[in-house]
Amino acid sequence: MAKMMMLQQHQPSFSLLTSSLSDFNGAKLHLQVQYKRKVHQPKGALYVSASSEKKILIMGGTRFIGLFLSRILVKEGHQVTLFTRGKSPIAKQLPGESDQDFADFSSKILHLKGDRKDYDFVKSSLSAEGFDVVYDINGREAEEVEPILEALPKLEQYIYCSSAGVYLKSDILPHCEEDAVDPKSRHKGKLETESLLQSKGVNWTSIRPVYIYGPLNYNPVEEWFFHRLKAGRPIPVPNSGIQISQLGHVKDLATAFLNVLGNEKASREIFNISGEKYVTFDGLAKACAKAGGFPEPEIVHYNPKEFDFGKKKAFPFRDQHFFASVEKAKHVLGWKPEFDLVEGLTDSYNLDFGRGTFRKEADFTTDDMILSKKLVLQ
C-alpha cells in the first residue's frame, strides 16, 4: 500500500489544601509530603529555554489533552505539528473559544498524516522534518517510541504522557513518584516506555495524570454523573462511597506539560499531575450536582459482588482509594492547578454537557439492576 506524507497548514473553517482530602462536606485530612529542597517560583512561571520557537511534534492531539496543549504551545510561539491518522479534524473550534483565537490557531497548526504503528513511515517522515521536541500524548507501548527516537537523533526533549495507573496498589497513600509500580498493570506499556527513554539516554520527562476531566472528555468521568443528574435519577455508588479518589482538569494538565518544556529541572524526571484535593465517591456526586446546578442527589450504595454486570461497567472509577501527591510538580516546576474541583466541574459542564454535547449516550442498564434490587449498604 502506498504511503503518503502530508504536511498541511490548516486555514480556519469556521480552568483540599495541599494534599488534602475533602468529602465535599468540609472535612479535611492533611497528608503532607516533605521535600528537602523547596524551589520558590512565581505563579504561572514557565521554563522555556532561551532559544525562541521550537519545532514541536505532538503524537495525537485531536481527542482531548492535545486539543488544549496544542493551543497553549501555538500561543507561546512554537511551530506545532500534530501526527494523527487523519480521522478527526486537526482544527476544530473548542467550546468557549473565540472566533479570533480559533482563526489564529487554525492558520498555524500543521498536520503530519500517518499511522504511528507504521514504523518505516514514522522514521522517514520524522527524519525529514527534524523536530526539536516531541510530546507523546497517545503512546501506549515502548515499541511505538523507539522509531521516533531513531528518527530524531538530535531531539532536545521527549515529553511523555504516562499514567498514575502504573503504581502498585498500596495501603499507604498518596502515591508518590518514587513509589513501587505494578509490572502487571494494564498500563505496563507506559512503564516500559519510561524505561526505554531512560535507557536511551535522551532528555525525557514523564507526566503521570490520575483521572482527567474537563470539556470534551472522551472518558465517561464527570459525564457519567451528569447524565444521571439531568435525568433526575439516583446515583449508584459501590460499597460505602467513602473511597477516596482524585481528578485533575485537562487545562491544568496542559499547563503542566508546558511547564516541563525546556526546563532543566524536569530532565529525566517523573511528575504526578492532578488536582490538589482528594474527594470521596459520594463527594464527587455532590460536587457534580453543584457544578451543574442540580439538587443534591440521592446516593444509593450497593455491593458489586451481588451483581453480574457482564461486560458493562457500572461505575466509572476503580473501586478503591486511588490518589497521588502533586507536591513534586508544585515545588520543582512551580506549577499549581488553576481549578478546584467544583470550579473545574462547572467549567466542564458549562462548556460541554450543559450545552447538550457529550461523548456517550446515557445507559442506565446497570443502574436499573441495582435499583430494582434495592440493596443499600448503610
Swiss-Prot record:
Q: What is this protein called?
A: Chloroplast stem-loop binding protein of 41 kDa b, chloroplastic
Q: Where is the transit peptide?
A: 1-50
What PANTHER family does the database record attribute to this sequence?
Answer: CHLOROPLAST STEM-LOOP BINDING PROTEIN OF 41 KDA B, CHLOROPLASTIC, UDP-GLUCOSE 4-EPIMERASE
Cite the Gene3D superfamilies for this sequence.
NAD(P)-binding Rossmann-like Domain
Q: Choose one Gene Ontology CC annotation of this protein and give it.
A: apoplast
Which CDD domains does the record associate with it?
SDR_a1
The upper taxonomy is:
Eukaryota, Viridiplantae, Streptophyta, Embryophyta, Tracheophyta
| Signal peptide feature range | none
GO MF term (any one): mRNA binding
Tell me the Gene Ontology biological-process terms attached to this UniProt entry.
cellular response to water deprivation; chloroplast organization; circadian rhythm; monosaccharide metabolic process; plastid translation; polysaccharide catabolic process; positive regulation of DNA-templated transcription; positive regulation of translation
State the oligomer form and interacting partners. Component of a complex made of CSP41A, CSP41B, ribosomes, and the plastid-encoded RNA polymerase. Interacts with CSP41A. Binds DNA when in complex with PRIN2.
Tell me the function of this protein: Binds and cleaves RNA, particularly in stem-loops. Associates with pre-ribosomal particles in chloroplasts, and participates in chloroplast ribosomal RNA metabolism, probably during the final steps of 23S rRNA maturation. May enhance transcription by the plastid-encoded polymerase and translation in plastid via the stabilization of ribosome assembly intermediates. Required for chloroplast integrity. Involved in the regulation of the circadian system. Involved in the regulation of heteroglycans and monosaccharide mobilization.
